[in-house]
Amino acid sequence: MGWHDGCIRCMVGVPFASVIATVLCFAGVALFCGCGHEALSGTEKLIETYFSKNYQEYEYLIHVINAFQYVIYGIAIFFFLFGILLLAEGFYTTTAIKHILGEFKPPAIKGGLISTVTGGTPKGRSTRGRQPVHTIELICRCLGKWLGHPDKFVGVTYIITILWILIFACSAVPVYIYFNTWVTCQSIAFPGKTTTSVSTLCSDARMYGVLPWNAFPGKVCGTSLLAICKTSEFQMTFHLFIAAFVGAAATLVALLTYMVGASFNYAVLRVTGRSDRSKF
């Protein structure tokens, strides 16, 4: 019975929304970074194979793609650390709220984590004649002093969410370009659905700013474009960009969940016990 009660008490302090958001964030970032990296490499191969024969015409594009790939590496590392930090903050604030409401009082961390939020010294302890501090409790006290500012985490998460919305919007651009190309290929494959001559249906990389206007040929038309759309390189790159877009959307949902949960916990900590809903 004691083991069962201990498990129940531990489960009470688990921030389920933060755990779900962390898993969603890691999955979304992994999908965005992995698929986005490979999709950029595929785009580079398609450009240099079909749209331009002069290296100087797409040299700048290669530098931009390489820069984006390095940015992707940084995004992956940052969100790995930031996700762990926000998950720790979720555990911290949930434990503090449960302690304030009298629902969950873990003996190992009540002296370190809780006093940081409540601003006072834990009950049963005085500044004089302190007892020897165990290693776990000392670690928790240090962690509590570091994580004891949920308002700052709300602000940081809000800023990161705004920045990620911009990244999410940018990830839709290549999906739009490839989708337009795919629609053009469908019109070429089924000429009865359009009154335009097949030879005039083209995909122009210069129109999207991918290549300079003096690039040659810069565009592919008619059956040549249809042949490109049927290649595994084009289809794989198109689907990778879609997967990266979905990963960016999942990461955005995770950040919004983080922000809502952190704001809720901070509000509850401010009013100290006026609400008993703290599963974030």
From Swiss-Prot:
Record PANTHER family: MYELIN PROTEOLIPID (PTHR11683), MYELIN PROTEOLIPID PROTEIN (PTHR11683:SF11)
Family designation: Belongs to the myelin proteolipid protein family.
Gene Ontology MF term list: structural constituent of myelin sheath
Ranges in the topological domain labelled Cytoplasmic: 1-10, 89-152, 270-280
The organism's place on the tree of life at top rank: Eukaryota
Protein's name according to its UniProt entry: Myelin proteolipid protein A
Annotated organism of origin: Xenopus laevis (African clawed frog)
Bilayer disposition of the protein: Multi-pass membrane protein
Location (main, coarse): membrane
